[in-house]
Amino acid sequence: MTVINHTLGFPRVGLRRELKKAQESYWAGQSTREDLLAVGRELRARHWDQQKQAGIDLLPVGDFAWYDHVLTTSLLLGNVPARHQNKDGSVDIDTLFRLGRGRAPTGEPAAAAEMTKWFNTNYHYMVPEFVKGQQFKLTWTQLLDEVDEALALGHNIKPVLLGPVTYLWLGKVKGEQFDRLSLLNDILPVYQQVLAELAKRGVEWVQIDEPALVLELPQEWLDAFKPAYDALTGQTKLLLTTYFEGVTPNLDTITALPVQGLHVDLVHGKDEVAELNKRLPSDWLLSAGLVNGRNVWRADLTEKYAQIKDIVGKRDVWVASSCSLLHSPIDLSVETRLDAEVKSWFAFALQKCEELALLRDALNSGDTAKLVEWSAPIQARRHSTRVHNAAVEKRLAAITAKDSQRENAYEVRAEAQRARFNLPAWPTTTIGSFPQTTEIRGLRLDFKKGNLDANNYRTGIAEHIKQAIIEQERLGLDVLVHGEAERNDMVEYFGEHLDGFVFTQNGWVQSYGSRCVKPPVVIGDVSRPEAITVEWAKYAQSLTDKPVKGMLTGPVTILCWSFPREDVTRETIAKQIALALRDEVADLEAAGIGIIQIDEPALREGLPLRRSDWDAYLQWGVEAFRINAAVAKNDTQIHTHMCYCEFNDIMDSIAALDADVITIETSRSDMELLESFEEFDYPNEIGPGVYDIHSPNVPSVEWIEALLAKAAQRIPAERLWVNPDCGLKTRGWPETRAALANMVKAAQNLRQG
């Protein structure tokens, strides 16, 4: 029983974000479809070779996606909404991009598919849409084509396929309501066809991802797995693959399935090994997800070895990443600016492949010397002064209930704020960022590289802020923002100004489509050495008589969108960040900034996957926000922003944030999300997003008015704000001006009745 290793998936974007650049070039009409496809082929070949060279035995195929892997599965199944379909029913890469970006085959605007977070990660997927009587057929052969590519290159492969039950679980019914699980028998023939094609190609194992099996699923969904897999068994060996949590609660369902192996995330389900070995059928292979695919930390391989060694020899064992390495940067070796101590604590995707090779070799030989050597920096980190700050720990320990309470209740604050700002009905604002032009990015890059001195950099940024204020005043917006020209990323910017964070040069991970982020890494206790945003906010406010919002990223979002420490709880990190940003709120207020937005778009995505674990998380998540905000006086208006959220099941917690105004993403869901606020009788003010900033489409005045009228049926008009769904950083100025002009006009029309 020789141990082999494999990965569940590998980053797609390329070390230099080649995929992003190729996508955006194609979308802009600057390159051909063949140019784009060639980049994809080159990246796949390179990534297979890199994994092989790093010691991986069984390579994943089908983990590559042009936008996201759920959208790829939708095309595989022929699930294309009517508004995006070609007249002849054909499917091509442009169909895929239309679904992701919002466009009809004619070139006319058509709503993009709804986008939401992939389980509790910072990766997004396009939500499958289901209609009654829907037909499915194999229409997009990307997986089969890529299998052919890999086989032609001589690789030992394992195709990756999103499983049918999870696919249905992730989708939404559109139009007439029905049970989407009823579509299972309709999609299974397509899966059977795909598996048959893979078997024809000599494929032995298929990794079939069913991460829904780590959730607390309704019984009817659990019951669906057995008939589904009865239909799929027999053509290839199936590795049923789960991740992001352990599987013990659903083991009875799992062990009844006719599959040949099970992959389990043993990072999150680290205590499950003995139970798995006891309850899995003896002829099943166990794929042990020992190396964390979601972080940047070097693994303690001595600990991982001890975790699995007792069952090696008792059943077939593979060692693997806990989940796809999609969520990790690609290669630590190109990071030349990290100091040696910190760098020794990290492992990116390729280094995680090396870890899997070391584990495999040690488990097969019994020789752990190399594991001990690899793990030495982990032991040293536990005592590093880079990690521990006594002053931060003391301040955190001294927090009391009073620290998370505003001076007065919302009703009292609202009166003070109305007197201070005297805003019109249907007040208009934006979420914070304005287009990051080539000029702005060049300015920041030149400054970072030392090609521009501080004075010239500041002069350049000040000019862009001034222009943003002029644009907003010309458009007639009521509450302005400074535009965030100085910020590269809403989390990275704050991390750069807080102690306890470090940054990479090339630590990019995919967020959605062509969007990549470079998360900061929390390596130690967090504190704020000096004010971060005050100077630019104060400057922007000096340019106008209208209120300018101070813009902060909230503590939970900074936590969720960073790579966190593993040696303390997430609660500890969030509250340390909250205390640092509390000082920023106080400084903004002292500088005359009367409206302060604390963005928490990640509050919901941070939820544990199992509902039974939610309360504890929400309690400390809300407390962190309140610690951050509660220092504000009554007449300082605290805003927060959330996107990609289902709110109905966390409304108590959203209300408990006690923000004076919440702006939310609603346009893609056609204001459906407001149902939650209506049913809860949410007491504070709400800005439902009136257009989708992820699409280049410019909404008409009538479209916006219709959405706002729909919102006013659910929320009293006197408590409604008018704003886009999200920040405008990724948009161009022409479409931004046009969309905001229509938004302001719609608000003015509503004021006039």
Swiss-Prot record:
Residues holding L-methionine: I431, G432, S433, E484, D599
Leading EC class: transferase
Pathway terms, separated by semicolons: Amino-acid biosynthesis; L-methionine biosynthesis via de novo pathway; L-methionine from L-homocysteine (MetE route): step 1/1
Keywords associated with the record: Amino-acid biosynthesis, Metal-binding, Methionine biosynthesis, Methyltransferase, Repeat, Transferase, Zinc
InterPro entries registered for this protein in UniProt: Cbl-indep_Met_Synth_N, Cobalamin-indep_Met_synthase, Met_Synth_C/arc, UROD/MetE-like_sf
UniProt remark on cofactor binding: Binds 1 zinc ion per subunit.
EC number: 2.1.1.14
Active site, UniProt feature: H694
Entry coiled-coil feature ranges: none
Residues noted as binding Zn(2+) in the record, renumbered to the chain: H641, C643, E665, C726
Binding-site residues, 5-methyltetrahydropteroyltri-L-glutamate: R17, E18, L19, K20, K117, R515, C516, W561, E605
Biological process terms in GO annotation: methionine biosynthetic process; methylation
Keyword Signal recorded: no
Binding residue positions for L-homocysteine: I431, G432, S433, E484, D599
Keyword Metal-binding: yes
Cofactor: Zn(2+)
Reaction(s) catalysed (UniProt annotation): 5-methyltetrahydropteroyltri-L-glutamate + L-homocysteine = tetrahydropteroyltri-L-glutamate + L-methionine
Top-rank lineage group of the source organism: Bacteria
Gene3D superfamilies associated with the record: 3.20.20.210
GO MF annotation, one: zinc ion binding
Role: Catalyzes the transfer of a methyl group from 5-methyltetrahydrofolate to homocysteine resulting in methionine formation.
Family: Belongs to the vitamin-B12 independent methionine synthase family.
Name of the protein described by the UniProt record: 5-methyltetrahydropteroyltriglutamate--homocysteine methyltransferase
Organism: Enterobacter sp. (strain 638)
Gene this protein is translated from: metE
